[in-house]
UniProtKB/Swiss-Prot annotation:
<keyword id="KW-0689">Ribosomal protein</keyword>
<dbReference type="Pfam" id="PF00411">
    <property type="entry name" value="Ribosomal_S11"/>
</dbReference>
<protein>
    <recommendedName>
        <fullName>Small ribosomal subunit protein uS11</fullName>
    </recommendedName>
</protein>
<dbReference type="GO" id="GO:0005840">
    <property type="term" value="C:ribosome"/>
</dbReference>
<keyword id="KW-0687">Ribonucleoprotein</keyword>
<comment type="function">
    <text>Located on the platform of the 30S subunit, it bridges several disparate RNA helices of the 16S rRNA. Forms part of the Shine-Dalgarno cleft in the 70S ribosome.</text>
</comment>
<comment type="similarity">
    <text>Belongs to the universal ribosomal protein uS11 family.</text>
</comment>
<dbReference type="GO" id="GO:0006412">
    <property type="term" value="P:translation"/>
</dbReference>
<dbReference type="InterPro" id="IPR018102">
    <property type="entry name" value="Ribosomal_uS11_CS"/>
</dbReference>
<dbReference type="GO" id="GO:0003735">
    <property type="term" value="F:structural constituent of ribosome"/>
</dbReference>
<keyword id="KW-0699">rRNA-binding</keyword>
<dbReference type="InterPro" id="IPR001971">
    <property type="entry name" value="Ribosomal_uS11"/>
</dbReference>
<keyword id="KW-0694">RNA-binding</keyword>
<dbReference type="GO" id="GO:1990904">
    <property type="term" value="C:ribonucleoprotein complex"/>
</dbReference>
<dbReference type="GO" id="GO:0019843">
    <property type="term" value="F:rRNA binding"/>
</dbReference>
<dbReference type="InterPro" id="IPR019981">
    <property type="entry name" value="Ribosomal_uS11_bac-type"/>
</dbReference>
<dbReference type="InterPro" id="IPR036967">
    <property type="entry name" value="Ribosomal_uS11_sf"/>
</dbReference>
Amino acid sequence: MAKANSRVKKKAKQVVTDAVAHVHATFNNTIVTITDRQGNALCWATSGGSGFRGSRKSTPFAAQVAAERAGQMATEYGVKNMDVMVKGPGPGRDSAVRGLNSVGFKITSISDVTPIPHNGCRPPKKRRV
């Protein structure tokens, strides 16, 4: 017996005016995640997913492009104001914030949330080239 065709309702996108942009900048990649105030992810973009591969993935320009892509997706949710939380030592820290600013958001605060150990794990040995 075949199941009757029932319409699947598409989930309506919520309207969020205030959001938080989490920029995770590593030495190899930059991940930009935009969440609401409660921490629920709205959209995200990476410099690797923006078409950059290899060593070009870790450039400031790739981080700026990733931030602009995430910002374009966030405008579909009606985001106007944004807090930016930057984590990590990567080269795309500042340019990702500039990319979010160029989309047209009103950036209310920029905070550095890089985790700093209080003498925790032993760091990796120094590179010898």
